[in-house]
Amino acid sequence: MQRIIKNNEVVDETWHLLPKDFNIDDISNCDDLIVPLQLWREHSRMLKARDGGLGVWLDADEEAEEIGDDVAEFQVIALNFPAFTDGRNYSNARLLRDRYGFKGELRAIGDVLRDQLFYMHRCGFDAFALRADKDPYEALESLKDFSVTYPAATDEPLPLFRRR
């Protein structure tokens, strides 16, 4: 079983992340699922009628605005980082938290590495599914890499000069 970082601790993964090519006929009624955006668009009524938990995941080329009106439907929103160098979903995280008021779990998935976690957390992420070859316990320490931050962000809306 995969382990993820959630709310500053390492826990067992309990959600099933469905791939983009998943067949909707194979969906369980009671499992907790994180579905790709396209599957949500095509089958939202059926997905909402299930008994299990519901989440959605966006790829880096998909926009937060596409689910802005639906965020209350999801317990989890996962944002995919296809490469360490692709930072587009940092912006989506800020939009989901600050503009759309998403209060559920915001999870980073894909090519997620230790060096990114502190900055992802500042943008509103509270869960991290690290790349399979990385140790979540070691990566957890990165959330304490810096004790003071200067600019405002989702995790601290006041810049340092306003906190005095």
Regions of interest found by a model, annotated:
Residues 10-58:
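A positional/architectural concept
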Residues 137-164:
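C-terminal helical cap(s) of enzyme catalytic domains, especially alpha/beta-barrels
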Residues 125-143:
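Glycine-rich phosphate-binding active-site loops on the catalytic face of alpha/beta enzymes
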Residues 53-96:
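Glycine/Thr-rich beta-alpha phosphate-binding loop at enzyme active sites
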Residues 49-56, 95-108:
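Short beta-strand/loop segments at the ligand-binding rim of alpha/beta enzyme cores
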Residues 60, 106-114:
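Glycine-rich beta-to-alpha transition loops that act as phosphate-gripper elements at the mouths
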Residues 56, 65-69, 114-127:
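Catalytic cores of alpha/beta
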Residues 39-46, 84-96, 137-145:
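Active-site-adjacent beta->alpha loops and helix N-cap segments on the catalytic face
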